[in-house]
Structures are given as structure tokens and as C-alpha cells.
């Protein structure tokens, strides 16, 4: 169930972000910044065609099952809208690496 929710939200939100910021590397960076800047210690790094987002997300603490399954599903569907691949680098801090193809 968490994966289904994550995929649904990832696709819907990413479509809106593409409309707002575009689907290039800068659009991906701006979208992630717009969506997750509320996370404690949030930071973004851009290296070539890769964006690494990292922060201390409270979802792991309050809903660990969603963190494990739903967050990755969200990130995968989100990345698709930017024609990117994503991998989870770590859970604490929550770190994802997006690479545009």
C-alpha cells in the first residue's frame, strides 16, 4: 500500500513541478528545493547531470514503513517525469541521487 501511495504522489507532484520549473537539471533541482526545503539540514548538490538531495526527514521517525517503501516509490515516479534515474543513498540522513539520462 505504501508503494502505491508513493507512486501516485510522485507522479502527480512531479507533473506539477515539471509545469512549474521544467524537466531539465535546473527544473529537477528547483523542484526538489521547492518540495523538501522544510527538512531539517536540507541540502542539494548538483554535479553535472546529477542532483543529490539530503535532509533529516521526520517520516522515518513517525511512519517508518512508509519511509522504507513509499519514499523510494515516490522518488522513482518523481524521477521518471524528469527522465532521470534515482537511487537511495542513505536513510539517515534521507539522501537520494537523481541522474538525468
Language model segments and positions:
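N-terminal accessory segment detector
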Residues: 1-50, 54-76, 82-91, 95-101
